Amino acid sequence: VSAAETQVTEATEATTLAPATDEEKAQAAEVGKKIDAIYVQNWSEDTEKLCKEAKEAWDALSDSAKAEVKGEHASPEYFGLDTGDVTKDNPLNQDEIGEKEILVVSFGTSYNDSRAKDIGGIESYLAKQFPDYSVRRAFTSQIIMNHILARDGEKIDNVEQALERAKKNGVKELIVQPTHLMQGKEYDELKETLDKHKADFAKVALAEPLLGEVGKDAEEINADKEQVATLLVQAAVTDGGFDSVQKAGQEGAAFVFLGHGTSHT
């Protein structure tokens, strides 16, 4: 056996966890219940307290017990997975908004690096393009907001909270820019929530999702959809190492585009 193989074996043995005791398994089960309790779509007055309690209970576990955490939605990855540096993400939940605001509404992601780069990138771009407006953030997935709050202590507003913040800060002109792909359930719920608050502002505008308005039928394709389709194909061809769609076709390449889907017709 080589010296390198010996080192690998020793390192593996050093990181092998001791079996969890019955007491540790019971503690892990309680943490699983606490995670499941905050894995919900509705916010309540107890949400922040429950998130804090779940994290404190996780931190108190031994490594062996953490490996035993499970539940309907709970797993060791809920708190244990490294998704990047949360301090690089700006939750944009500050007050002192001013009279003009762009509220960027996203489904959200609990992956810190992706959130800062992708969602944060859109928010930063809008802030540069519209310097007369304050840009703020809201997510539509309370499950994700709870995950971020519990694991990292970062508070992100849901839509209701963001609209209340805008009202409290005296915003008069509100533009809501969703990052949703299409007019699905999340977009419909956003419209419903916004309708309840329209009277709180002098001017309110809701932008369309990326793929634009729904046509009368599947044959109606608007300019937004055409542009997105063109850009997707260009990106796929480039990522595949081809100079053009024609070249890819000549070499027998096929590209498959997979979407999340929606029950909306």
Which role fits each region the language model picked out?
Residues 4-7, 13-80:
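Beta-rich interaction/scaffold domains
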Residues 4, 17, 73-265:
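Active-site-proximal alpha-helix that buttresses catalytic centers in soluble enzyme cores
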